[in-house]
């Protein structure tokens, strides 16, 4: 995930935190700090806010445990784990591949909600124990709050639609029933759209009834799930469409190279005008490739600065650009490009030489070509999917 800050490793997994975690940390703190006075009165405001912050941190730790459970079970199933990231909507466990069997997929998906439900039971038992040893009521209230929120988190994630864990469970069930992981994945994604529309409707109803913050938040979550479910369906459909397709089939071969030492104004006048390319590998004076520059980056340079800014200054560093080999499956490259967003490009290399480039426009063209060649497939990308790649170019 872009803009994520690495925190280190836990249990061997790379753990990142996105800046949007600050938003949910504040929301959790505010929620608990404003709830406690109505439950246990008589404390100074600073106590409520300190306990609110402490409870929020514990809840973030619970979210991390939820994601680490996915990661641990995935590793045991032989699926590589690239990272675990906390962000606005909880967490994301980035897997380096797919489960090989429906049973393994089911276990990986269920591990997260099971952990949240177990944490709910643990915090509930802690609250009961603390009550038995005459612990201050305000501390017991925080424990009950953590038990309740973890329970809701576990149950919410079991809703039957991708990208929620419940959608992964639906996918595992359909995969086992029909023996087709693609059909199962698309079915789970479409179920996710239905779940999202229900959440949006409930959020709007709550908003109309006077629950302004809760209604907007619920509708926003529904909108996110709808968008993510559509993205999931597009990804699976594209994988099916491109089964057996190599990177060499999609790339633009022998792309023109941008000299990194010339200024942006000269580059636009001498290289870009009259060309159809949207991105260029950037080379230094000895011919080695140092990065990639796209038209969007050129546009971002103010006209007054173009004569004093070199192409190398604005190029995306090579270590941030996905790379692939010509004979590699295209689907594997698209998986690596996906986390970087719809505007991402990739360089195709043989040895130390760049032999091609893959842009969103290249992918969009290939989608159109393969749709023409397969006019009535069981599952295909929609016309909007090709437009999505094309617009990003």
UniProtKB/Swiss-Prot annotation:
Observed phenotype of the null mutant: Not essential. No effect on processing of anti-sigma factors RsdA, RskA, RslA or RsmA.
Cofactor dependence: Zn(2+)
Keyword Plastid carried by entry: no
Database matches in InterPro entries: CBS_dom (IPR000644), CBS_dom_sf (IPR046342), Peptidase_M50 (IPR008915), UCP006404_Pept_M50_CBS (IPR016483)
Topology term for the membrane: Multi-pass membrane protein
Active-site residues, record numbering mapped to chain: 67
Cellular localization per UniProt: Cell membrane
Protease among keywords: yes
Gene3D superfamilies: CBS-domain
Molecular function terms from GO: metal ion binding; metallopeptidase activity
Residue sites binding Zn(2+) per the record: 66, 70
Cofactor notes: Binds 1 zinc ion per subunit.
GO BP term (any one): proteolysis
Keyword annotations of the record: CBS domain, Cell membrane, Hydrolase, Membrane, Metal-binding, Metalloprotease, Protease, Repeat, Transmembrane, Transmembrane helix, Zinc
Limits of the CBS domain: 251-308, 315-376
Name recorded for this polypeptide: Putative zinc metalloprotease Rip3
Gene: rip3
């Amino acid at each position: 995930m872009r803009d994520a800050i690495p925190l280190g490793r836990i249990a061997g997994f790379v753990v990142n935190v996105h800046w949007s975690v600050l938003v949910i940390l504040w929301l959790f703190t505010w929620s608990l700090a404003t709830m406690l006075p109505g439950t246990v009165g008589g404390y100074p405001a600073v106590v409520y806010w300190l306990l609110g912050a402490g409870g929020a941190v514990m809840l973030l730790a619970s979210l991390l445990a939820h994601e680490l459970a996915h990661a641990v079970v995935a590793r045991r199933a032989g699926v590589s784990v690239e990272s675990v990231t906390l962000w606005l909507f909880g967490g994301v466990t980035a897997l380096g591949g797919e489960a090989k069997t429906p049973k393994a997929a089911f276990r990986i998906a269920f591990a997260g909600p099971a952990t949240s439900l177990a944490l709910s039971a643990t915090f509930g038992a802690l609250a009961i124990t603390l009550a038995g040893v005459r612990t201050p009521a305000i501390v017991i209230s925080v424990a009950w709050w953590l038990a309740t929120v973890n329970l809701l988190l576990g149950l919410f994630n079991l809703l039957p639609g991708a990208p929620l864990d419940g959608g992964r469970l639906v996918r595992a069930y359909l995969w086992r029933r029909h023996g087709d992981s693609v059909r199962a994945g698309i079915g789970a994604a479409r179920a996710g759209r239905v779940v999202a529309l229900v959440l949006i409707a409930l959020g709007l109803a709550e908003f109309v009834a006077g629950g302004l913050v809760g209604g907007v938040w619920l509708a926003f979550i529904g909108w996110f799930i709808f968008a993510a479910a559509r993205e999931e369906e597009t990804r699976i459909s594209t994988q099916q469409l491109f089964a057996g397709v190599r990177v060499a089939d999609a790339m633009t071969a022998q792309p023109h190279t941008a000299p990194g030492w010339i200024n942006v104004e000269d580059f636009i006048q001498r290289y870009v005008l009259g060309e159809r390319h949207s991105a260029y590998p950037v080379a230094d004076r000895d011919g080695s490739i140092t990065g990639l520059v796209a038209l969007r980056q050129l546009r971002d340079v103010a006209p007054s600065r173009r004569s004093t800014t070199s192409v190398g200054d604005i190029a995306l560093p090579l270590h941030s650009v996905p790379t692939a080999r010509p004979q590699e499956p295209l689907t594997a490259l698209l998986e690596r490009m996906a986390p970087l967003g719809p505007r991402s490009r990739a360089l195709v290399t043989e040895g130390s030489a760049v032999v091609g480039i893959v842009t969103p426009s290249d992918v969009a063209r290939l989608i159109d070509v393969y749709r023409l060649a397969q006019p009535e497939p069981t599952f295909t990308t929609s016309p909007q999917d090709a437009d999505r790649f094309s617009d990003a170019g």
